[in-house]
């Protein structure tokens, strides 16, 4: 129940007007490692690994401007969702270019039918019987992800995983945020 209340409060905060975001320069590589370290032990039969991680060629590493708490939450929601639906593998990759960055979370589960790609981000949406309260989902996680990335001037996308065959959820946003 506490988790549901937390999800609802987070969603309400992100949905109402413009939340106060404190954009900071963060190391995307470190964030990916942190989320994998936090979540990988929770489901021993699913291997959560880093996929291809490419940083900009400016010798400046994988830094991006983001609100650290919210970007962490978005990545955590996507990885835990992928783990819940994976058969045995989840992969987290990123690309940081000069102007834009992208994170891809792929799994080897059944995937999401293309006909449901847009509505999967709808609050309280569950596509099948595997997405029940018993599986740990409340139907708000992907809605929260979409709102978080919206406030970063980006997009949350879904496609079929080219590498693992299941779903691929992607976050894409500007590497630097516009100053107010």
What are these regions (language model features)?
Residues 16-21, 59-66:
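Conserved micro-motifs of the catalytic ATP-binding
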Residues 89-99:
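Short beta-strand/loop element within the Bergerat-fold HATPase_c
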Residues 107:
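Acidic ATP/Mg2+-coordinating residue in the GHKL
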Residues 112-124:
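Short conserved segment of the HATPase_c
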Residues 141, 145:
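Short alpha-helical Gxxx[C/S/T] motif in the catalytic ATP-binding
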Residues 153-160:
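Glycine-rich ATP-binding loops of the HATPase_c
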């Amino acid at each position: 129940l506490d988790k549901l209340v937390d999800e609802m409060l987070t969603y309400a905060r992100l949905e109402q007007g413009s939340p106060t975001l404190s954009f900071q320069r963060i190391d995307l590589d470190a964030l990916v490692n942190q989320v994998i370290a936090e979540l990988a032990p929770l489901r021993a039969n699913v291997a959560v690994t880093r996929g291809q991680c490419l940083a900009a060629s400016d010798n400046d590493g994988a830094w991006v401007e983001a609100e650290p708490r919210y970007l962490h939450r978005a990545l955590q929601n996507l990885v835990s969702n992928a783990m819940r639906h994976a058969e045995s593998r989840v992969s987290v990759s990123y690309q940081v270019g000069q102007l834009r960055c992208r994170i891809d979370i792929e799994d080897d589960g059944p995937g999401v039918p293309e006909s449901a790609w847009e509505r999967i981000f709808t609050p309280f949406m569950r596509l099948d019987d595997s997405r029940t309260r018993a599986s740990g989902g409340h139907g708000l996680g992907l809605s929260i992800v979409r709102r978080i990335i919206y406030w970063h001037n980006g997009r949350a996308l879904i496609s079929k995983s080219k590498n693992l065959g299941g779903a691929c959820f992607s976050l894409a946003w500007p590497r630097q945020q516009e100053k107010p």
